[in-house]
Structure formats: C-alpha cells, structure tokens
C-alpha cells in the first residue's frame, strides 16, 4: 500500500524540524561550553590542595606506605609552591611519619591506571610550614590559559593542543597541574579560537596579540608556548626545546627549556609556571610578623547575595585574620579587614578576584583605604 502525499509531506516536515532542533542543540551546547569555561576560568579556590594522587602498581602494604609518603610530599609542595621545601629537615621527618597528618586514603581505578589517593590535615601541614618559617600558598590562585603549539619533527607542521583536539598531552597537562595545585585551562579549539589564533600565531609567541585575543576566557594569566627542534650553535647539534611566555597584560616572563621528550618538557614547564606563581602569591613568615588593618569600600553591593559573595572572598584569603562589616551606605559596603600582610601585598592578592575591580583613580590615603567595585551578580 503506497503512502499518501500528505503523509510524506508531514514526515518530511518533521524530519526538517528534527534537523533544526539538532542544529539548535549543537549551537546551544557549544555556547554553553564556552560560557562554562569563561565562568570557570576566574580565580576560584583550589579545593584539592590537601589531596595527593600517586599512580601505583598494586595495593600491598609496602606500596601503600611508599605512595603515602609521596602523596604527602605532593601536598607539601602544593601548599608551599616550591619543591625545594622537601629539603627542610622537619618536612623530611614529617614525610617519614606522614600517618600523623593522614585523614583518609583509598585506591581508585582510573581506566588502566591504579591510583593511591590520600587526604591530609591541611591545617596541621600549614602549621608545620609556618613553624619552619616556610611560605604558605593559599587556596585562591590565579587562573591561566595555555596556548601550546607543537611542531612535527618530520614534516615541520605546527598544531595546537586544545580541548577539542585528540592530543596525547591533554591528560599529562591535567595531571601535572593537579600535582602542583594550579589551574591551567586549554583553549576550547572552536570556530572563534580558530578565527582568532592559528598554530602559526601561537608559534610566533607574540605575547600582546595572543593575550588580547584570549580575553574571552577571562583568565588572570595567558601562557604561550611552542615545542620543536632547534639547532644549538654551541654544540653544533639539534635539541628539543620549549619556549614560553607568561603574561597578565602588565608583566611578562619568558624562558626556554631543553629536554629529551615533549612530555618531559611540558612537565618541566608546568613546574616552572607553578614556581613563578608561588613566588608572586605565596606568603612568607617574614611578611606575617605584623597585623595590618585596612578599610575596603566596595560599591554595587546592593543585594544580600552580593554581600555574601564579597564576605566569602574576604574571609577565604589565607592572609585574613578578621573581617567586619563597618557600614552600608546605599550600594557601598564598607569592610574592615585585618590581615598579616601589608596593604600592597593584599591588593596583589585581591587582583585575582575579577569581580572586584579597582577604580582608575587612586586615593591619597590608599595605604589604609581601598575602593573596589563589585562586578557580577
């Protein structure tokens, strides 16, 4: 029995509707992904600083003991920011007796990898670091965007490592940044990224151009890096090199790393990047010998939700001793913040909060009063 023309027309229209809906869903999904990444990219607390993860081969008592020590050392480096902290005598003793700091541990199967995962008492470790006059790096840390171009050593073609690529290095970057307690996002690799920056653009390492075309991600820092074979005039031989820059739009750091493998170079870079951030944002005991008080006037705080968000940020800072609401006049909330670092150091830390913006003008009494505007809901 042959179907009627009317039925076929209706079926055709339904099929077209499904195609339209599917296309709309795809667009919405990409938009949502971009929005989610942009929102996530702003400075936020790193919640896993007291957790360590170590890949193991079995679940024996010997392996658990060895992995527990390594996980503890991983957490120590996360909370301090500098691997050399492990050379401290008391830290070495604590690592040997890591069970005193252990809260819980478990084995997790992740694909073909068996992982020992441990949680430690963060406050006890922070107390250990401070007792030894070692730096402490708080939970609120800068976000970064990582543009990485890799050159094929055979055909010399350049390719970008993005979230949408099938690069073998994505998992390595994720694990390396976890190990150091930092956030380093990879570009989505969508149409907008493709129109803004190509692999050759990143390969050139033009920092100002790459930074300006990365605004959509809203990160505190933008990193550009390239990996490829270069000729070393001194040794008259070829070597594998990673060159990079780190910028926040105002300052820039550059360096070159030589290694045997791309994976090894990426791991070295992540360690250097984490060390750089720690040198800027971790707090030394010598800075915390005095108590400082400053008044913060924050405008556009006109709802209870905004007030709570501001208060959460201020109280979560490692340097904060006490926060009090001093006054509320129209949409301006005035807080008195007592901290253990000078005002200029506090301002450096607060620059990570993209919802808090300083006005262009500067107060004469900026040593005791700071003005901010709340941006966001």
What is the predicted role of each segment?
Residues 99-108, 186-188, 201-234, 350-366:
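A short, hydrophobic beta-strand-centered structural micro-motif
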Residues 4-28:
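Bacterial N-terminal signal peptides that target proteins for export
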Residues 88-149, 162-164, 168:
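Signal peptide-directed extracytoplasmic domains
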Residues 68-90, 146-204, 310-335, 340, ...:
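N-terminal segment of the mature soluble domain
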Residues 51-94, 209, 261-272, 276, ...:
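Short, well-ordered alpha-helical segments
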Residues 47-53, 57, 214-267, 368-376:
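Amphipathic beta-strand/beta-sheet edge segments enriched in Tyr/Trp
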Residues 297-306, 339-340:
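Short, surface-exposed ligand-recognition loops at beta-strand->loop->(often short) alpha-helix junctions
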Residues 26-36:
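Bacterial N-terminal signal peptides
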